[in-house]
């Protein structure tokens, strides 16, 4: 349930972040107040951090590895997400063509660095606070969110 709860909490937070920064544009493809790419990215960061924690290295190297692995992995996920949304829904929700160091339309080195920094902020500042809340979410709430998400995704795909 831990990862499901993180997925939903960060997808919802991601939706509001997108709405705040891009208030003139719809921040996603789903009806609900969630932007799944943030939830997926969070799960990936948590798994990368779990993998790095297996190694007996000092904290500085852990932070560097987290930054590098998250930057690369999340840039790839962002690019795949952009192409999938374009292919499935014929929508372009973001376009980094104007970035100096873009790698195609859907990712750039600038954004990759932001994702790397965000992963450090998530693991070392947000996660310690959020873990206390995440672990207390009742299973029934998680199951309800899963059902609502599947319903939302199904309706969205049917109406594409």
Provide a role label for each language-model segment:
Residues 1-160:
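Aromatic-rich, lipid-facing transmembrane alpha helices and their immediate juxtamembrane interface loops
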